[in-house]
Amino acid sequence: MEVLMAERANLVFHNKVIDGTAMKRLISRLIDHFGMAYTSHILDQVKTLGFQQATATSISLGIDDLLTIPSKRWLVQDAEEQSFILEKHHHSGNVHAVEKLRQSIEIWYATSEFLRQEMNPNFRMTDPFNPVHIMSFSGARGNASQVHQLVGMRGLMSDPQGQMIDLPIQSNLREGLSLTEYIISCYGARKGVVDTAVRTSDAGYLTRRLVEVVQHIVVRRKDCGTARGISVSLGNGMMSENIFIQTLIGRVLADDIYMGTRCIATRNQDIGSGLVNQFITFRAQPIYIRTPFTCRSTSWICQLCYGRSPTHGDLVELGEAVGIIAGQSIGEPGTQLTLRTFHTGGVFTGGIAEHVRAPSNGKIKFNEDLVHPTRTRHGHPAFVCSIDLYVTIESEDILHNVNIPPKSFLLVQNDQYVESEQVIAEIRAGTSTLNFKEKVRKHIYSDSEGEMHWNTDVYHAPEFTYGNVHLLPKTSHLWILLGEPRRSDLISLSIHKDQDQMNARSFSVKKRSISNLSVTNDQVRHKFFSSDFFGKKEEEHPDYSELNRIVRCNLRYPTIPYADYDLLAKRRRKRFIIPLQSIQERENELMPPSGISIEIPINGIFRINSILAFFDDPRYRRKSSGITKYGTIEVDPIAKKEDLIEYRGVKEFKPKYQIKVDRFFFIPEEMHILPGSSSIMVRNNSIIGIDTQIALTTRSRVGGLVRVEIKKKRIELKIFSGDIHFPGETDKISRHSGVLIPPGTGKTNSKESKKGKNWIYVQRITPTNKKYFVLVRPVVTYEITDGINLVRLFPPDLLQEMDNVQLRVVNYILYGNGKPIREIYNTSIQLVRTCLVLNCTQDKKSSYIEETRTSFVEIGINGLSRDFIKIDLVKSPISYTAKRNDPSRSGLIYENGSDCTNINPFSSRFFYYSNARIKESLNQNQGTIHTLFNRNKEYQSLIILSSSNCFRMGPFNNVKYHNVIKESIKKDPPIPIRNLLGPLGTALKTANFYPFSHLITYNQILVINYLQLDNLKQTFQVIKYFLMDEIGKIYNYDLCSNIILNPFNLNWYFLQHNYCEGMSTIMSLGQFICENVCIAKNGPHLKSGQVLIVKMDSVVIRSAKPYLATPGATVHGHYGEILYEGDTLVTFIYEKSRSGDITQGLPKVEQVLEVRSIDSISMNLEKRVEGWHECITRTLGIPWGFLIGAELTIVQSRIALVNKIQKVYRSQGVQIHNRHIEIIVRQITSKVLVSEDGMSNVFLPGELIGLLRAERMGRALEEAICYRAVLLGITKASLNTQSFISEASFQETARVLAKAALRGRIDWLKGLKENVVLGGMIPVGTGFEGLVHSSRQHTNLSLETKNNNIFEGEMRDILFHHRKFFDSCFSKNFHDTSEQSFIGIGFNDS
């Protein structure tokens, strides 16, 4: 006792508050000083003291102790205000969705962090003895972030995919959560409800699989005698000291360790903490340790390779079941691992950037040539510098120099005045290799309906030439011009045509939609109705617009009397039919009318050699399905024109084959497509008669052989008509199948030989387990003639002006050789199409002509309406008068890369309205119809300019120009009208922007007044009528001459004074205006839109919605296409850093152990295994390459796997000793696959054998066995063990037992599980003794054979010669695995 007192007197007396960490330090010093027993005695006293004090002060925790932080209210308010401003920016198109998401997450993250920092000072000031504060601060219970959730705010959560939800949980648990917040936190939080429920079962199953793999591994021997080891070194900085200590303690050295000449530790010595400290002090390098990987045994492990037992700190005892311990050590913490870690979603790229702040107030100066403008990741404008930049701040009396490193963002402008502590630059944090980034796609969906436009040139994505995916080269806006879509499935019945104005009285077709029957080739079925203007009732012409999805109507255009004009389905047509028969002929014949279809591409541009018109000859039309064959005659299968159809993202080639043949064959067959659920009443390969019932509702039309095929949820049933022929032995025909036999050959051995009659098609059919027979099918032969001369159909004067355009006739077969053709819903199938191909003669003058543009022109004169086809030659480098720099012009880049400005894909129409029409159009306009394609390539009408999506700004100034004009017109009528209204006296076409050609009658009243007078006749006699082309040129199509008047400049400007800024705004037609731009004196303009009409006193603006897109974004959809709400508009690809992985935790461990390749695994190990293997084999050749390659590959992949699994556990704060993981990894990497390269006599190629067994066999037979390393998952490894009883008790019991019985496998009952199943004694612990067999002589044998080993000398040389090569391999392949490298001493020992 006195001794104790004396020692106590020498102790230092501490008088201070201790928290958890100080307590830890105290305990460790006590243990070092006094040992274990004494320390526990002291701690006991401390505990009693603590309880006494707690009882005295009576700490309790009630709900009133949870005090919220007073500053929370205004902090949250401030964050909400910032979010609101951000939302406004997003709405007006200044930032896009990704930038908005990033910024809002940073705003809320900062708010939440600030609240958390406020928490402690607040408690200290208001209530220092608050139990919550005492507990969390002293480390007794809870930490800062938990308390923060109780009294601060819960903050941001991640969704099930690990993405951040940008809706933060503002309440804390004291205030209670709203329903939305509760649901978000169920998913996002670390121990969320959803998370825990799933996790328990997953972890249990993982444990079971792990134990299954390693249950037979028991410590059986003291030493296996291996000389190999794995090197661990601290020197290269990749490994923290902490991990280094954890790795070494409890291991056994594989080699002596020297410090200079002095040996500080010997081989087979186990490492304690003292030795580790010496290693750290002396920086001994490298240290070779023994691990389960290096143990030479196959199905057990030795004491020295395992090391110390974690329970009592001595070497592990013999007979200990270390395998099961390892499996459980890894599986059990799985319940603590989350399925996803809770972190801030990795939204901050490369960590939060550092800020550079201004040292004092002053004016900032820098060299502007060194910076270029850019956007920060929040969408703010900034400058980025590529090299070091010196920034000077001039304050009153002193100059400050600030150096800004390269790649930083400068947030201020030159000569700007900055205040002290203002952020002037943002330094990008150096991206470390550990935080690897991942690319994330974010889709932006449109939230309104309308038409799509963009303001910049857009590149077509090269892999989708015909698709609708475009890439943006620079930052720009996408606009959706608002409109109300109207379903127009029966377009031709609707009275309205594109660009018509709807009056209040006008009516549209009631909605009668025909559902689009989806057919096998994804064609869209349209039904069109044509009105017959000659008193007959309507007839129906169903048509598949298959090739270009272009609508066709068989309408006749005689001169239509004015009264019927409105009935004509006025619509933009892309195909046009020139009648071939007069109406009298058509009434006499019952044949369906066939006309020439003129096919105009969607953009109205013909390339050379493209098809202008085609004629479907009724002789080549079939009603039934079948197969086309060209027979034995050669055909030139050049796909002259390949139509690539992209329909809902599916690419499909439709080649047309140019025929060089004079006949082809069609083999008819009957085909029924039935839904998968229907019951079929006939068997496959059976023979039926005519009108047999084959399904509940279907009867056969012909008799013959039935073939049934089941494809993707539907059943195809084909009936082949023809004769069945059972061949004899000597029959030649029987050897052929699928051949055409010309007439006159006849059939041998057949009585009914049809000589010289027809061609026949022979098909050989082998039903199951029956004798095969031959089916002889009839063939329809088609001769191909030249068809109609199409060129004559065009009036000669049409081609006079273009003598260098020639048309030639080509026949195309629409279906390839042997392609099955299906009839769909009783439509006829056209087999041959006669096409008129446009061919420009390339003479010197017109050598630059590459394409012609065509459009249909509908001209109305005095109430009559006729249609013409107009062909214009276009010179190839398209040069229009449009100014390239004009921001309001829209450009479009076509596939050939030339920049076509303002090509309107819809042909314009211009009408000269007679009196009655113009009067009618004076009624209140309700809107304008605009017909476009939507994404499914169907026609669709939009109502634009209705009161809902169009508004008028103005008046700008108070002068009424109307009166002035009226007076001047009365004096001298024709001239002012010409000056004001354009040559036609009606309207200026306001469509300089691209798919609009809008007719707006402007000052209509004046027109009417003076059209009634006769003095305008002269004007209109000179100008017969005008056509207005898409580009805005006005053509004077006088019949005698072909003069082009000066192009009408539509891009006219309107100058008016803007009183907001005192400067004038120039407004042009078609210009897009964002929100809050000043265009009038009465304040800023409130909505965004596009200028449609500019009048003297007002503008009409069509509502539009901007979406910002940055470079590299992908735009979906074509220009001018109709979008519905919810369609994908843009896809952004942005980088975000991830801390480790987002799918962390259990799923990640399982992926690694099951060796599944998932994107989130940074390196797909299986591929790397093959890669290393090939690389080494190439270097060293066979067989050395194989042996060394397999060996190295296995070592490398083992180290990589261990590191991966450890990384996941460490990231979650779970400590597992490496050797547990090593035991499991050893089992899943211990098999090799015998390869075919060096054929050995022992194993079959493709056989899975143990690595050690392969090596021993190679030594015994003194020949090289070639094999490669494979990675098995834990499930596979448990099904590939030496014991079939253990396998059968795990999975697939019947299969395993059956296979074992067939192979005659023997189970030696070495593992635990087999013995448990059979009720024997398990070979561990006390039951271990019976199994130990004295195998000393075995060891001696192996030592003697050393000298005879054929590999020894050469192997050593090769290994040491290539040592550097291997080392470099390692350092390249692993970023974090060089903590353990590989020592290649003596492969002969293995």
Curated annotation (Swiss-Prot):
Reaction equation(s) it catalyzes: RNA(n) + a ribonucleoside 5'-triphosphate = RNA(n+1) + diphosphate
Transcription keyword on record: yes
EC number(s) on file: 2.7.7.6
Family of this protein: Belongs to the RNA polymerase beta' chain family. RpoC2 subfamily.
GO-annotated cellular components: chloroplast; DNA-directed RNA polymerase complex; mitochondrion
Keywords of the record: Chloroplast, DNA-directed RNA polymerase, Metal-binding, Nucleotidyltransferase, Plastid, Transcription, Transferase, Zinc
TM helices/strands, residue ranges: none
Cofactors required: Zn(2+)
Cofactor binding remark: Binds 1 Zn(2+) ion per subunit.
Alphabetical list of Gene3D superfamilies matching this protein: 1.10.132.30, 1.10.150.390, 1.10.1790.20, RNA polymerase Rpb1, domain 3
An individual GO BP term: DNA-templated transcription
Complex and partners: In plastids the minimal PEP RNA polymerase catalytic core is composed of four subunits: alpha, beta, beta', and beta''. When a (nuclear-encoded) sigma factor is associated with the core the holoenzyme is formed, which can initiate transcription.
Name of the molecule in the record: DNA-directed RNA polymerase subunit beta''
Function: DNA-dependent RNA polymerase catalyzes the transcription of DNA into RNA using the four ribonucleoside triphosphates as substrates.
Pfam families hit by this protein: RNA_pol_Rpb1_4, RNA_pol_Rpb1_5
Gene name tied to this protein: rpoC2
SUPFAM superfamilies linked to this entry: beta and beta-prime subunits of DNA dependent RNA-polymerase
UniProt main location, coarse: plastid
HAMAP family registered for this protein in UniProt: RNApol_bact_RpoC2 (MF_01324)
Subcellular locations according to the entry: Plastid, Chloroplast
Binding residue positions for Zn(2+): C224, C295, C302, C305
Superkingdom: Eukaryota
GO molecular function: DNA binding; DNA-directed RNA polymerase activity; zinc ion binding
Family annotation (NCBIfam families): rpoC2_cyan (TIGR02388)
